């Protein structure tokens, strides 16, 4: 199984890179994990609605190029479904049973995701109504993916 994490923007903070790297190492026992960082568009101060739409559209084009035709896509969006960790674990296990070999998670840029990406997604997922920095969300999501595999394995990691 392959798990891809497509993110808009480059990760700069060392502590976040270190945390993600640790979970990538742990995930290597269960799957091939790949984090793809895409260039984000600069958002001008006082950008108009049309400017924001254009920016999200450009970012969506970059994202779309990295999604495989047969990928099961989960896009993170505030309006998405929320799951307890156990249900998330069942979801990941169930995707492979349905014949998908790649699960692709998408974290958009500071403006969010264009509707074309949300429509392509098999599922929209939310971590709640809190606003988190997109860079921190990468670490949180990577840990939850690892936790999902550990739950499936029956490990005491998830208590």
From Swiss-Prot:
Instruction: Please tell me which top-level EC class this enzyme sits in.
Output: transferase
- What is this enzyme's EC? 2.1.1.177
Q: Which reaction does it catalyse?
A: pseudouridine(1915) in 23S rRNA + S-adenosyl-L-methionine = N(3)-methylpseudouridine(1915) in 23S rRNA + S-adenosyl-L-homocysteine + H(+)
GO terms, molecular function: rRNA (pseudouridine-N3-)-methyltransferase activity
| A GO-annotated cellular component | cytoplasm
Predominant location of this chain? cytoplasm
Pfam families from the entry?
A: SPOUT_MTase (PF02590)
Q: Which residues form a coiled coil?
A: none
Give the matching InterPro entries.
Answer: Alpha/beta_knot_MTases, RlmH-like, tRNA_m1G_MTases_N
Give the binding site residues for S-adenosyl-L-methionine.
76, 108, 127-132
UniProtKB keywords: Cytoplasm, Methyltransferase, rRNA processing, S-adenosyl-L-methionine, Transferase
Q: Where in the cell is it found?
A: Cytoplasm
According to the record's subunit comment, the protein's assembly and interactions are:
Homodimer.
Any idea what job this protein has? Specifically methylates the pseudouridine at position 1915 (m3Psi1915) in 23S rRNA.
- Family to which this protein belongs: Belongs to the RNA methyltransferase RlmH family.
Task: Kindly provide the name given to this protein in its UniProt entry.
Answer: Ribosomal RNA large subunit methyltransferase H
Q: Which gene encodes it?
A: rlmH
């Amino acid at each position: 199984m392959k798990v891809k994490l497509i993110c808009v923007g480059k990760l700069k903070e060392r502590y976040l890179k270190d945390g993600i790297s640790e979970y990538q190492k742990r995930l290597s026992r269960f799957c091939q994990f790949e984090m793809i960082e895409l260039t984000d568009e600069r958002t001008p101060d006082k950008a108009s609605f049309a400017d924001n739409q254009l920016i999200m559209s450009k970012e969506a084009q970059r994202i779309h190029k990295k999604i495989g035709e047969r990928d099961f896509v989960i896009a993170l969006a505030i309006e998405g479904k929320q799951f307890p960790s156990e249900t998330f674990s069942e979801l990941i296990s169930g995707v492979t049973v349905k014949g998908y070999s790649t699960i692709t998670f998408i974290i958009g840029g500071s403006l969010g995701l264009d509707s074309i990406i949300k429509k392509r997604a098999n599922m929209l997922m939310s971590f709640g109504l809190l606003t988190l920095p997109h860079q921190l969300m990468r670490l949180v999501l990577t840990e939850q993916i690892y936790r999902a595999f550990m739950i499936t394995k029956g490990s005491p990691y998830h208590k």
